[in-house]
Swiss-Prot record:
The keyword Protein transport does not apply. This is N-acetyl-gamma-glutamyl-phosphate reductase. Pathway: Amino-acid biosynthesis; L-arginine biosynthesis; N(2)-acetyl-L-ornithine from L-glutamate: step 3/4. Catalyzes the NADPH-dependent reduction of N-acetyl-5-glutamyl phosphate to yield N-acetyl-L-glutamate 5-semialdehyde. It is an enzyme of class 1 (oxidoreductase). PROSITE patterns: ARGC (PS01224). PANTHER family: N-ACETYL-GAMMA-GLUTAMYL-PHOSPHATE REDUCTASE, CHLOROPLASTIC-RELATED (PTHR32338:SF10), N-ACETYL-GAMMA-GLUTAMYL-PHOSPHATE REDUCTASE, CHLOROPLASTIC-RELATED-RELATED (PTHR32338). It catalyses: N-acetyl-L-glutamate 5-semialdehyde + phosphate + NADP(+) = N-acetyl-L-glutamyl 5-phosphate + NADPH + H(+). One of its GO terms (molecular function) is N-acetyl-gamma-glutamyl-phosphate reductase activity. It is found in: Cytoplasm. Its EC number is 1.2.1.38. Coiled coil: none annotated. The active site is at C155.
Amino acid sequence: MKNIAIIGASGYTGAQITSLINAEANLSIQGLYVSESSLDKGKPLSELYPAYSHISLCLNPLSEDAKQTIVATADAVVLATDHAVSLHLAAWFYQQGLAVFDLSGAYRFSDVAQYPKWYGFTHEYPQVLADAVYGLAEWNSDQIAATKMIAVPGCYPTASLIALKPLSHLLTDVLPVINAVSGVTGAGRKAQLHTSFCEVSLTPYGVLAHRHQPEIATQLGQEVIFTPHLGNFKRGILATITVKLKPGTTLSDIQQAYQCYDSAELVTVKQNQFPKVDDVVQTPHCHLGWKFDEQTGYLVVASAIDNLMKGAASQALQCIKIHFGESVK
């Protein structure tokens, strides 16, 4: 039985992974934590999320004493905290010998030069960063098992990279174009005008300036054009990706490329049949659908995930299971 501490448990992602870990026979929750300044400290999780009424745990303030208790009694810590908060917490817990599963972007880039531009801070822990592994579960399982510092990918990169990485050897210099729509939960739980009921519509945001663009490009090994959109639904992501493939590429080449997922428990691939968000919401699955025009050499692949599950919490759980040698289903 592995004991997991969850920090940032009051947010959508933190609450979601609390629910997932609570349902695992071989994992237990060491405790739920929020910042000492949080208005939610001391509250039962079920007060914030009545759907989790079966979880009788309260949100504890993350004091210095609480941190020492975590080190003494937990095997791993999940960080569902802001990037700048995770930067320090992840390094501290890692240096104490715990396995760290960080859901922020604080350890996703291996290059320290990326952080001032995309996250607004200078990375203070280059050695910890050097040890970090990008937790794209279907692709980096050996590294996830071998390290104690796992940077869980962003939601848009997860949807995009699962679709594109099998094709990396078939891509040309023409940049892949990724148009992706996310549910409102992707913007977090904090009240904001643009995510309020009367304001939500369908609109692009972060155009040519979203931090997930370089994350996707770094992991793919090729620049991309990425445009995220905020949709008028609660949860889920649909990424529709257009790519130019090398001259002479055939349907058989693409079919063979996607055979890499034949044994993947959580990825489904279909040709000439496209996924919809409703089919993956509240699940840890990624559904891919693709179609290829041999005359023009263009392929369109669509990728659907739940942004809070495969795009965050359930992928973190995958990484936890891989790291501790549990089967992933």
